[in-house]
Amino acid sequence: MAKGLDVGTSFIVLSSEGESGTVEYKDFRDAFYVIKPTTPIASKMIEKGLVGKTFVKDTDGSYIILGKDAIEKAVERNDSAKRPMYRGVVSSKEKDARRVLSYILKEVAGKASKKGEKLVFCVPAQPVDQEDDDFDVGYHEDVVKKILEECSYDSRAINEAEALCYSELADDDYTGVALSWGAGMVNVCVMLSGEPVVKFSTTKSGDWVDRMAAVATGETDSVVQAEKEQGDFTIGRPSSDNQVLAAVSTYYDRLIDYTTKQLAVAMEGHKALPNFKDPLPVVVAGGTTKAKGFVAHFEKKLSENGFPLPVKEVRHASDPLHAVARGCLIASQIL
């Protein structure tokens, strides 16, 4: 049995083929929160309160809570959960990032059904809007491969937006443009007849919206994230009733404007771009694209900001939260 794994900044998604031939998914929030008890009694009470939740007890007696439970605990304490990843790769900002990512990946992927089981996972492309040395895809890929090797998988990495192309462009002869809007980055792939000809990323996405809205309103990132995911707002129409959602709507507008300008600059005159004879489908996926009005606003900004390729349509992936994981599974099945 082959598997696919979307190793995202905000979510880890495992895809596998079910008994009936359908694709099954396992989602896990890519987050952690540490509670350090002050007394032995507090330690016992905290552990009782964590029954049924996913956590690891650390060597110093603290509790590392994982997944959605980490977000809930952080919000309860008016704090922000942490992540082992930042902008699509293992975070250099968290000293425990590699260890926590190992806990999470092993929780999600589990042990291989047999030694050498095929698994394809996704990695981001090099960003076009960041020129420093903080972004290291190679190290990130090696870390993930090592963790999966410990689970007895034979793993291979592919580009995140390339995986989205495999998932969503089958009816378009695998020709078009795919954008995966994750929490940390936007990954872009231009594909021609199944060949990825241009791949790059930009470094602002859903997390940037949360951070800027948090700064504007004085809330924590986790509170903003929770309100954004549960709230009712439309991009470009700030709410007058909720200042957090009003800020989120405003920064979504800025994010889409920024990204479409980066797309135009990165692709204009790109030597690897073919001369496409027909207009191209543009597919968007990822949790950031779930906001109301996203597709229409993105299509409008593409046109306004001079996207250099002919566009047939802009459409949502059939399953925006799972499309990349599905593409990884498709790649794994043909290896």
Where are these regions (language model features)?
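A structural feature that tracks compact, well-ordered secondary-structure segments
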Residues: N187-C189
